[in-house]
Amino acid sequence: MRFNGLDLNLLVALDALMTERSLTAAARKINLSQPAMSAAVARLRSYFRDELFAMRGRKLVPTSRAEGLAAPVREALMHIELSIIARDAFDPAQSNRRFRIGLCDFITIVFFRHVAERVAREAPAVSFELVALADEHDELLRRGELDFIILPEPFMSSAHPRIALFEERLVCVGCGTNGELRRRLTFDRYMTMGHVAVKLGVARMPPIEESFLLDRGLNRRIDILVHSYGMIPPMLMGTSRIGTMPLRLVKHFETTMPLRIAELPRPFPTFTEAVQWPVLQNSDPESIWMREILLQEAARMTSTSDDCSMSYASEQADTEGRLTSVASRLS
């Protein structure tokens, strides 16, 4: 099929080449022989009057013209797939959809494992690829290379639809033997104590508390920098260092490590974790089903963890009461 002299099948070939950066892999992806893919490249070069790709070692490197074509071609193909091509009615139990989701280890441990467990029961052929957060997550959504991202709302753009999942609060955490956390933590002490801090994923994305401090021109003392939340607790053991982590995640690690939890000094805010998806998938039945699963599991987790939060608040109040009583006796 041609449009203004362009064989539209060539756009499928161009999209595969941009995604795979390999002639052989691109041909395999769209079920073409390698000679047929080579012929498609020649026709693309002729139509666009540009080399489009150059070989560097065993990898195809796109020209600036090819880079400029990549996003609109991907969007056009996604629009055709989602809006024009007729699809069978969606049946989760029969679906073999693979969802690519960008998220951090905090979300994986405290939330997404419940989602995966439920999907395994209700849609056993549905699979997931969980990827580290990247700087260009907004662009990856636009190109359809990610189906969802799960992030704190302040880190999301307005280019794609999103919906809130659950609220989370941060706490200070240290080794169970850390005597510095036995008394109320002031902001000055928080800033000057040695921190084990996280920069998330390949993007080295600052966590919510780091963004909060940097927005105010403040820098805390960081002794150890790690790339995932799960690396913080082991690095606290046997030291007087502290970390800042989501409460739900701390409660998870508290079952296997001797941790001491302390309230952060005011005014550290709570934050909302949200899910975002490509605007072109807004009406996609499979995406809608997955969103409903995410929302339902978030509501279920929130209802069960409210009891945990109330218990934690009660423990904190009891501890503060005991400390006040001791202080009054000493005075």
From Swiss-Prot:
One of its GO terms (molecular function) is DNA-binding transcription factor activity. Residues 6-63 form the HTH lysR-type domain. It comes from the Bacteria. InterPro entries: LysR-type_TF, LysR_subst-bd, NodD_PBP2, Tscrpt_reg_HTH_LysR, WH-like_DNA-bd_sf, WH_DNA-bd_sf. Gene3D superfamilies: Periplasmic binding protein-like II, Winged helix-like DNA-binding domain superfamily/Winged helix DNA-binding domain. PROSITE patterns: HTH_LYSR (PS50931). NodD regulates the expression of the nodABCFE genes which encode other nodulation proteins. NodD is also a negative regulator of its own expression. Binds flavonoids as inducers. PANTHER family: HTH-TYPE TRANSCRIPTIONAL REGULATOR LEUO, HTH-TYPE TRANSCRIPTIONAL REGULATOR LEUO-RELATED. Belongs to the LysR transcriptional regulatory family. This is Nodulation protein D 2.
